[in-house]
Amino acid sequence: MSFVGREPRARAAAALAIAIGILASARSPHASAFASRDDFDASADKFAFESTSSQDAKVDLSAVASIDAKAETRALWVLRTSLTTPDHIAALVRSARDNGFNTLLVQVRGRGDAYYLGSVEPRPAELLRQPDTFDPLESVLEAGHAAGLRVHAWVNVNLISSATDLPAAREHVVYRHAAWLMVPRDIAQELATIEPESPAYVGKLARWTRAQPNEIEGLYTSPIVTEAADYTDSIVRDLAHRYAVDGIHLDYARYPSDRFDYSRPAIRAFRSAVRESIPAATRRTLDAEEAVDLFAYPDALPDEWRSFRIARMTALVSRLHATVKRERPEALVTAAVAPDMHDAFQHRLQDWGGWLEAGLIDAICPMAYTTEPAKFAEQIAAAREAAGT
């Protein structure tokens, strides 16, 4: 993984350590190195940086320390499973420093929960054995800054719950605001007959999600639903306001696939956005069809529907960027993105090329997960070209 961006301080080349353990090096003044990654949740402990000395690691992390670049960003993804005790935090900071890293991307919102104090979101079960005063993010900030490391808060934007293990806390957003959840086309008609307040709604969505493990990681909130976007923005604003973070790292700022979001609120929002721009006769026809077909408007206007969903995701990213800069102007705002810009746009409705072009993000981190060095180099080169670096 690497930071790739148009901002001079965020530009990157290919001094990279990716989660699966491939190490490459280069001489860019702003290269970056990453290890451990949330997309591998099923084996999170394997990738968590909580046990590690350099000899335990998948790669010889000490090699990173020898890269000669004064202004380099050598960043490490730190899973939330590494933040559960003060000892784990002390060990990860020490290991990161000793192995040449200078930046930690610390996962503080993994599944609509809070690995920090004072949030409206619930404290995760993994922290229940710790004192109520234990604040993982503040602990990393104190130890990391003392060790000369930069610390970014890593936030999962839309992914807010596992479908396999639904949240135990009843105040979780999944239960309080089920209407905010993204819905796949496959079961949208059926879910439209169930009130979101009913346990059957989340139950049906979770069962479908569990049956699609290769397509979707869990339950997502929708960037189309205004209240959901407001909520996500409030989480990021609170983090940037109360904690001396050096950056906010956005993950899962995308749709699971282009088969989402066919929820009732999303389709209503689309209808409202396009009704005045279509002929009155077409409008009357679609209104009549919608009474029996939830997909009347999206199916009649497929290009507009795709563009609308992409635009709403972009609008949320833009909003989060503006919020962070308002609260903490010097903080970087970065995003983990699908490595192929065209695939991200077509299949994840994630326009990260547009984000960079418009200055809505300071840098991207391409999720170049492969054991093939040639493919890895190709993906990073394509991302650099798209970013103009």
Label the model's feature ranges.
Residues 47, 59-86:
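Boundary/entry segment of secreted carbohydrate-active catalytic domains
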Residues 67-75, 81, 158-242:
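Active-site-adjacent "subsite" loops/lids of carbohydrate-active enzymes
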Residues 74-83, 120-134, 215-230, 301-312, ...:
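The substrate-binding groove and active-site-proximal loops of carbohydrate-active enzymes
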Residues 83-97, 228-238, 343-357, 376-380:
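Short, acidic/polar
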Residues 88-113, 361:
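Catalytic domains of carbohydrate-active enzymes, especially glycoside hydrolases
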Residues 104, 144, 239, 251, ...:
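Conserved, mostly hydrophobic/aromatic
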Residues 112-156, 310-327:
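Aromatic-lined substrate-binding rim segments of carbohydrate-active enzymes
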Residues 273-389:
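Glycoside hydrolase catalytic-domain groove-lining segments
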